[in-house]
Amino acid sequence: MQVQLSESKNPLAYLLLIAPFFLWGTAMVAMKGIIPHTTPLFMAGVRLIPAGVLILMVAGFMGKPVPKSWLAWLWIIIFALVDGTLFQGFLAEGLVRTNAGLGSVMIDSQPLAVALLSFWLFQEHIGLWGWLGLGFGIIGISLIGLPQEWIFNLFDSGITIYTDNWQQLFNNGEWLMLLAALSMAVGTVMIRFVCQYADPVMATGWHMIIGGLPLWGISSVLESQQW
């Protein structure tokens, strides 16, 4: 059943439009609260695999076709590693090193990367106001994520970057959140190629399962006391 939200006057339709943003924000808070009781990579796998199984069950009930060609599975595997393993791995590790609110803001840099990738790959234009918004967004994300010393030095005496600054940048949670956002952006663009060979619902379910398995594998080697 197709719902025309733009033509509906039902208040529930507008709630459905903002629901993903609300659920996304609460997910960050929930993950931050769970991390002290488990390990980040194990938790990331738990986020993916059960949800993937549920999606496959729904897809089977809906009669969605199972991917059959090797190209379909190749794209699903690549999609899984980028949008599943890398995204959820960076996200979980980043939340260990930053708070949920700041982490959510850093993840919101993902639309900026999607716009740039779409312009490069598909020649999709967002117009003058879109690029202006992207510029303000990049400035805001930079002010949030870059070390304060870099920003102060830029206004005082130009950019002077030391080794300690690089170590601080690569070790803090904000940088990991940016890597998570970039992984999610690449995955968002990749779904267009995935859908050429596989049903999007089936591909989503399988990519969550396949993407979660490496997280559990890495967790079993590098982490302890997951339970």
Question: What kind of feature is each model-predicted range?
Answer:
Residues M1-G45, F152-Q196, P214-G217, V221:
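Glycine-/small-residue-enriched transmembrane alpha-helix faces in small-molecule transporters
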Residues K9-P11, P65-L74, H125-W131, D199-P200:
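Membrane-helix interface segments
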Residues L16-L17, F21, I76-A80, A92, ...:
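Residue-level signature of transmembrane alpha-helical cores of multipass secondary-active transporters
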Residues L23, A27-M28, L56-I107, A115, ...:
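Specific transmembrane alpha-helical segments of multi-pass solute transporters/efflux pumps
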Residues T26-T38, P50, Q88-T98, M106, ...:
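Juxtamembrane C-cap of transmembrane helices in multi-pass membrane transport proteins
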Residues F42-V53, V82, L91-G130, L134, ...:
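Specific alpha-helical transmembrane segments that line the substrate/conduction pathway
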Residues G52, L56-G60, F119-W120, S142-G145, ...:
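Membrane-embedded alpha-helical segments of multi-pass transporters/permeases
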Residues I55, I77, L117, I126-Y162, ...:
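Hydrophobic transmembrane alpha-helices of multi-pass small-molecule transport proteins
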